[in-house]
Amino acid sequence: MKILGIDPGSRITGYGVISKEGNRLIHVDNGAIFTDKAKDFPARLERIYRGLAEIIETYRPDAVAVENIFFSNNVQSALKLGQARGAAIVAGVIAGLPVFEYTALQVKQAVVGNGKAAKQQVQQMIKVLLNLPEIAQEDASDALAVAVCHANSSVLSGMLKIMDKVGKTNA
């Protein structure tokens, strides 16, 4: 299973592609889509959408995992982040992919085992889990963490479905 993780942002959108083969997580690619803050906001959203559509076309993931909005005191920033998330979600939906959303707490819990882990702990764990030569750029590392979260969540979901089936056949 190939997963595209996305850390949306109105200026920088991180992406990370991983492959899950059995119990192994394999790094495929990561990077960031940069938008030109001199351009109007709709053009920046288009840049995010087109950049992610190109990544989807290149790597053909089976699923897209997007980090959910964090709480923000700045309403304008929260709205722009929400719109960037929308562009990311639409890229996945138009490609016909299932899109999953995870909170920062869920991502940290899945990667480090602690929902209140520091960003540096998450980055270091991603480096170790994916056998990276160095810590990825911050936004890309966050996106890889979202992808790892989904990989771990899909394993748990599959286990729960199997347990549910076993429970029904034993009843």
From Swiss-Prot:
Show the InterPro entries listed in the entry: RNaseH-like_sf, RNaseH_sf, X-over_junc_endoDNase_Mg_BS, X-over_junc_endoDNase_RuvC
* Chemical reaction(s) catalysed: Endonucleolytic cleavage at a junction such as a reciprocal single-stranded crossover between two homologous DNA duplexes (Holliday junction)
| Cofactor annotation comment | Binds 2 Mg(2+) ion per subunit.
| Residue sites binding Mg(2+) 1 per the record | D7, D139
Q: Where in the cell is it found?
A: Cytoplasm
Asked if the Swiss-Prot or TrEMBL record annotates the protein with the keyword Nuclease, the reply is: yes
State a single Gene Ontology molecular function.
crossover junction DNA endonuclease activity
Kindly state one GO CC term assigned in the UniProt record: Holliday junction resolvase complex
Checking SUPFAM superfamilies in the record gives: Ribonuclease H-like
Pfam families for the chain: RuvC
Reported function: The RuvA-RuvB-RuvC complex processes Holliday junction (HJ) DNA during genetic recombination and DNA repair. Endonuclease that resolves HJ intermediates. Cleaves cruciform DNA by making single-stranded nicks across the HJ at symmetrical positions within the homologous arms, yielding a 5'-phosphate and a 3'-hydroxyl group; requires a central core of homology in the junction. The consensus cleavage sequence is 5'-(A/T)TT(C/G)-3'. Cleavage occurs on the 3'-side of the TT dinucleotide at the point of strand exchange.
Q: How does it assemble?
A: Homodimer which binds Holliday junction (HJ) DNA. The HJ becomes 2-fold symmetrical on binding to RuvC with unstacked arms; it has a different conformation from HJ DNA in complex with RuvA. In the full resolvosome a probable DNA-RuvA(4)-RuvB(12)-RuvC(2) complex forms which resolves the HJ.
Entry's NCBIfam families?
A: PRK00039.2-1, ruvC
* UniProt similarity note: Belongs to the RuvC family.
Q: Mind telling me what this protein is named?
A: Crossover junction endodeoxyribonuclease RuvC
Give the lineage: Bacteria, Pseudomonadati, Thermodesulfobacteriota, Desulfuromonadia, Geobacterales
Give the gene that encodes this protein: ruvC
